[in-house]
Amino acid sequence: MQKATYYDNSGLFGGYSYPKPDSYSYGPAHQSYPTANIESDYQGPVCPIQTPAVRPPALKDTDLNGDCMRQSSSQSSNSGTQAGSISEQQAPPLSASPPSSNSSASQKKKSPSGGASGAATPALTKQIFPWMKETRQNSKQKSNNCGEVSDEKSPPGPASKRVRTAYTSAQLVELEKEFHFNRYLCRPRRVEMANLLNLTERQIKIWFQNRRMKYKKDQKSKGLAHSPLGHSPDRSPPLSGPNHVGYSGQLQNVNSLSYDAPSPPSFAKPQQNMYGLAAYTAPLGGCIPQQKRYPGSEYEHHGMQSNGGFANANLQGSPVYVGGNFVDSMPASGPMFNLGHLPHPSSTSVDYSCAAQIPGNHHHGPCDPHPTYTDLTSHQASQGRIQEAPKLTHL
């Protein structure tokens, strides 16, 4: 059997170029050196012949046995003696007993360096560098995969920023639906929504706060879009001048108009701001049944007759006409407007200066040559009728 293994080994390793046998020293010390390196972790091309103190890296167990068998087969083939080859073949199995002592000695020699390296290795593994630490974003992703809510976790450091909560579309639909019916949630409903949507009460509360602020902002923007000037639409525009007319809010309050009777204006002024009767029939027609009582006087309102100068039937008993520049070609033979007995309260600034303009020598309807603007004090009992005194506001 020994011959067979010998010849097989020589056939397997015959292609190797072996060194000359003169360069090796054979002796009893030859069997001790491979045993010292059997369990070592060092790796080398061949089995070394030097002492363990200067030993180069060696192979592991399987490689070591193969190399030693290779070298022993080369030595035996070169020497040509079967006994030498058999002893070399038996060397690895026989040297299996001493490895304990030799390996322990080598372990003792290696212990200082090995202990230092072993101590350095745990130190390297225990040291955690900043880029190895787990960031909050990674922990959020992991917790989301596990189904946990990341907002409830306290941040790792005081400087870390809270990550925004990403709501799903289903959660947003439910929250918007709830906001449509109730802008403020009570506590039981909030708990119910939190259980339904798999959120926390704090998240739902914060979402509703943000949604209310968004709603208020939208309402403000809509309000500014509807009234760009910043005032309400029903507000009348300010008076820009003495001839500016504000009909809208003041024609309904004709009853409260106080009558101002200043000194009579000059009659032959150029044609401007004339008042045609057609311009007054529509806005003042609704004031027919109203009865006037002048402040401080006791004159009862009567219907005007056909000779009153204003021939339009719709305007009989209508309020007085305020004329800024009253243009009439009436002769001055009749009595003028002696209205000094009437009180003069503060007059509201109503000025109908936007009526239709007509030529300068036009009358206000078919008028008698003698006007019937009578003095209210002297003709009250004789005529049997009382005309309204026109309010003449000289502007």
Swiss-Prot record:
Annotated region described as Disordered, given as residue ranges: 1-122, 135-163, 217-247, 363-395
Intracellular or extracellular location(s): Nucleus
Start-end of Low complexity biased regions: 71-122
Annotated region of DNA binding: 160-219
Gene Ontology MF, one: DNA-binding transcription factor activity, RNA polymerase II-specific
GO CC annotation: nucleus
One Pfam family it belongs to: Homeodomain
Annotated signal sequence range: none
Keywords: Developmental protein, DNA-binding, Homeobox, Nucleus, Transcription, Transcription regulation
Antp-type hexapeptide, short sequence motif: residues: 128-133
Domain of life: Eukaryota
Biased segments, Polar residues type: 138-147, 374-385
Keyword Glycoprotein (UniProt): no
GO annotation (BP), single: regulation of transcription by RNA polymerase II
Function according to Swiss-Prot or TrEMBL: Sequence-specific transcription factor which is part of a developmental regulatory system that provides cells with specific positional identities on the anterior-posterior axis.
Family according to the record: Belongs to the Antp homeobox family.
PANTHER family, per the entry: HOMEOBOX PROTEIN HOX-D3, PROTEIN ZERKNUELLT 1-RELATED
Name by which UniProt lists this protein: Homeobox protein Hox-D3
Native species: Oryzias latipes (Japanese rice fish)
Lineage: Eukaryota, Metazoa, Chordata, Craniata, Vertebrata
